[in-house]
């Protein structure tokens, strides 16, 4: 922060107080006292400004401000948040939230600004596709998913019969969203959604979710303690947003409540209902990997630019194993788009309307591909035929835990060995990549894993 910037900040906070003093009956007997108050405030302001400037500039460089400024900034941020929340009351009431409900759940609400940072970093948009998929569709998740299918076979059979969505697809959503219910989020939804309603981008969207969360509590579907989830407001086994819950959640176990938190049955059925309502076509595939003839141009092709399978056949497109693309329940008139998530040198896919239904769950092609691929693997299919165009492929969660264990042994403070790559792990990886002479990308890829294994092997031989 520059000197002048902070001087303006101090004046900004104290000027209203000075104006109040000036405007308070200047002709009264208190005039003289008011002027003394103003002089005191001006002196305090100048003192604070000078004091903070001395702290801010050391050797010509900006450093951390003192606690006085921080307290002022924190107070102002808190006041701004409370003012924003109060201004939302009319809008909330127009959406069906009662005055008493709004007051009850907002009177002690405080902001959580960490969610703003997460809003600006979403791995499905910023992580290389091979990293994203390797962590979500690994042997560990595949095997556990198969166990879950067997464990919930009766319920899944009923769900599939009711909604026409395969058990493997429903369970794949469950696996990607919460690792089959084991990681559903610990954020207080009202705090997260309240903050996102007043800060950052997409405030209008998050306000709708904020009000929906209060309506859920108002109806008594869930308690506030149960309404915990992701930083963005998704909750339960299959991570529904509050408005999606209101629209599509179902009471499949017949207990009179739509419970995506404690009832696996309700969660699985609600997920199938979601996909059905978003256009899932029973008996049709989501898509499949294909290969194209040499010289084939993918320019202009996309998931949205769908064409008949007969037109793709005419252009020489076949399945990745070389077999014809028109098989089973597919017709020449079936519509599919060509998707190339890593460009022409990576795997290519023809995708149908069922892929779009999955995509609507979370609008990212990498996310939809993770669920689609996991559903195939749960049915016994193998991995993609064509490799991703990288010399540093992604790692599984087991391999990521191996990397984290090594980093801990090197003295890095990165938290638990859980296979989840956060900022601290990425920073530590960058340091080790430089140590090994690798490009400091911060990625938990195969190159750093091999370097670690080589290092450990050398230690074992000594």
Model-derived features with residue positions:
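Aromatic (phenylalanine/tyrosine) cluster motif
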Residues: 6-14, 47
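Catalytic glycan-binding domains that act on GlcNAc-containing polysaccharides
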Residues: 97-333, 346-351, 355-375, 379-397, ...
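Bacterial N-terminal signal peptides that target proteins for export
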Residues: 5-8, 30-39
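Short acidic, glycine/serine/threonine-rich helix-capping segments at coil-helix boundaries
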Residues: 395-400, 408-452
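Low-complexity, intrinsically disordered or signal/transmembrane-proximal segments
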Residues: 11-13, 24, 31
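N-terminal secretory targeting signals
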Residues: 35-109, 410, 434, 450-462
């Amino acid at each position: 922060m520059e000197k002048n910037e902070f001087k303006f900040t101090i004046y900004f906070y104290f000027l209203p107080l000075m104006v109040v003093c000036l405007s308070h009956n200047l002709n009264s007997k208190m005039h003289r006292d008011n002027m003394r108050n103003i002089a005191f405030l001006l002196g305090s302001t100048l003192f604070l400004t000078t004091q903070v400037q001395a702290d801010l500039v050391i050797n010509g460089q900006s450093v951390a401000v003192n606690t006085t400024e921080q307290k002022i900034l924190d107070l102002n941020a808190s006041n701004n948040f409370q003012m924003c929340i109060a201004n939302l009351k009319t809008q909330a009431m127009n959406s069906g939230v009662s005055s008493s409900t709004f007051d009850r759940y907002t009177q002690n609400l405080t902001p959580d600004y960490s969610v703003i940072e997460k809003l600006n970093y979403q791995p499905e948009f910023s992580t290389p596709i091979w990293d994203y998929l390797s962590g979500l569709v690994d042997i560990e998740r595949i095997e556990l998913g198969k166990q879950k299918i067997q464990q919930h076979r009766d319920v899944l059979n009923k769900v599939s019969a009711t909604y026409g969505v395969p058990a493997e697809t429903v369970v794949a959503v469950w696996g990607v969203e919460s690792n089959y219910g084991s990681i559903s989020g610990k954020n207080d939804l009202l705090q997260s959604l309240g903050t996102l309603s007043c800060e950052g981008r997409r405030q209008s969207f998050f306000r709708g979710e904020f009000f929906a969360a209060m309506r859920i509590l108002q109806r008594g579907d869930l308690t506030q303690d149960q309404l915990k989830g992701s930083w963005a407001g998704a909750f339960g086994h299959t991570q529904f947003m509050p408005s999606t819950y209101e629209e599509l959640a179902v009471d499949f176990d017949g207990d009179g409540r739509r419970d995506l938190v404690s009832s696996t049955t309700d969660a699985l059925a609600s997920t199938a209902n979601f996909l059905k309502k978003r256009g899932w076509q029973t008996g049709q595939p989501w898509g499949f990997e294909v290969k194209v003839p040499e010289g084939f141009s993918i320019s202009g092709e996309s998931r949205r630019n769908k064409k008949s399978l007969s037109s793709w056949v005419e252009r020489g497109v076949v399945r990745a194993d070389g077999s014809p693309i028109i098989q089973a329940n597919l017709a020449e008139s079936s519509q599919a788009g060509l998707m190339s998530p890593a460009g022409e040198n990576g795997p290519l896919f023809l995708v149908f309307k069922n892929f779009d239904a999955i995509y609507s769950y979370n609008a990212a092609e990498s996310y939809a591909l993770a669920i689609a691929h996991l559903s195939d693997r749960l049915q016994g299919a193998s991995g993609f035929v064509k490799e991703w165009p990288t010399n540093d492929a992604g790692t599984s969660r087991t391999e990521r835990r191996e990397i984290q264990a090594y980093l801990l042994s090197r003295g890095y403070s990165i938290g638990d060995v859980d296979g989840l790559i956060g900022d601290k792990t990425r920073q530590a990886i960058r340091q080790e990549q430089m140590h090994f002479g690798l490009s400091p990308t911060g990625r938990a890829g195969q190159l750093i894993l091999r370097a670690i294994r080589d290092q450990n092997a050398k230690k074992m031989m000594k």
